[in-house]
Amino acid sequence: TNIEPDHIGPNEHGSFEEYMRCKGMLFRQCRVGIANRDDSHWEQVMEGHTCRLETYGLSEEADLRAEGMRLTNRNGHLGVAFQVKGLMDFDAEIAMPGRFSVYNALTAIAICRHFGVPVEAVKKALREARVKGRIELVKVSDEFTLLIDYAHNAMALESLLTTLKEYDHGRLVCVFGCGGNRSRLRRYEMGEVSGRLADLTVITSDNPRFEEPQAIIDDIKTGIGKTDGKYIEICDRKEAIAYAIDNGQ
């Protein structure tokens, strides 16, 4: 669906170039490849592919496209309605917000087409699909909306926060932390993203593994310090979540 510098470090890939080469190997070991044409790195990943290639995206050049996107809000469930064009032609709606959710939906639609899944079954599945921990609605108050999302790198966090701002729900509070024994660059970048896009960031501990939680938080603060964003530091995750709920509006 997309690829950005991630999973790079002493215990992961040596470089982004190596990461892309490894992803590209998948398209030399299959008969049909399905790729997001809108991703800026898609041609590099597909270089040397031996499979029959199909693309999807929002651009006119994609084989399978989403057009006419509009935001929806049904009882607190933020979503997107759009038309599927190109290789297929029907109206669709998903109960998850954002362009990234549309890209994920297009991936699923493209796969279903190859397996001959009826269009009505595809439409129903898209309307009803929910993913635990991915833009998951947690009902705690009628005064604000609380969502949980796994967004674990800067690209995912920026996509999420940008999407939520499009719904114009007012004040945006972001509670997050970063995992230990992973790239420190990720922490700086996520701090900068949240500081730039959220009205308030609550920095907390996530899964420190074998690092000191405070050291990870300090790295996040380095990133957020590059912005004018407001933030508060609460190391205990339960207390951080409680603070965000108590101060929600």
Report the location of each language-model feature.
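Short linear Ser/Thr-Pro motifs
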Residues: T1, T55-G57, V193, T204-S205
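ATP-dependent carboxylate-amine ligase
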Residues: E12, T50, L87, T107-Q249
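Acidic, Mg2+-coordinating active-site environments of NTP-dependent enzymes
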Residues: N2-L146, K221-Y231
